[in-house]
Amino acid sequence: MDNTIIIPYSDVESKKEWLWKYRMPHKNVAFLYGSSEDAVEALIAEIIACVSMGRALAVDNMSRQAGRVIYQNFKDGQIGAVKASLERQKADCSNIAYVNFNHKKAMECIQELEKAIAEFQPSLVVLRNISQCMEKQKDLYDPLKMAPILHR
C-alpha cells in the first residue's frame, strides 16, 4: 500500500459532549415528537428536573452539576400546568425560568429569548409549542436558523 494509514475508531477520542449520553447532544438542537402530548410533557419534565437538580438521566450514570433551564411554552395558559409537571418530577424550580413575552411578535420573541439565554446562562433551553409564534413554521425545523440562538 502507498502511504495509507488505517486507524480503528476505537483509537479515536470522542469529542461529542452529551447532555443525555447518546441521546441528546450538549449545545445542539434536539427535537422531541410524540403522538401523546402527555408523554412528551412527562419526558421533558423529567429531563428538566434532572438538569435542574444535577441528577443522572434515565439509563445514564453521568454525574453532572445542577444547571439552569429555560422552559418556554408558547401555548397560552400553560405556565401553571408546566410548574405542576416540574414539581411532580421534583425539579428545582429556582433553576428553571421562562420569558414573559407579553404578546410580542415572533421576531421580538426571538430577540427577548436571545437576551434571556445570554443573561440566565442555561444548560438547556426547551421550546414547546413554538410553531404557535413562528411566522414560517419551516424555520422551526431548520437547525441552521435555530442553532445560533441556542448556542450562545
Question: PLM features: what roles do these ranges have?
Answer:
Residues 19, 62-148:
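Conserved inter-motif catalytic segment of the P-loop NTP-binding fold
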Residues 2-5, 41-45, 70-73, 98:
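N-terminal start-of-chain detector that recognizes signal peptides
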Residues 1-19:
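N-terminal pre-Walker A segment at the start of P-loop NTPase domains
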Residues 26-59:
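Glycine-rich P-loop/Walker A and Walker A-like loops and their local beta1-loop-alpha1 context
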Residues 10, 36-38, 103-105:
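Short, acidic/glycine-rich phosphate-metal binding loop used to engage nucleotide
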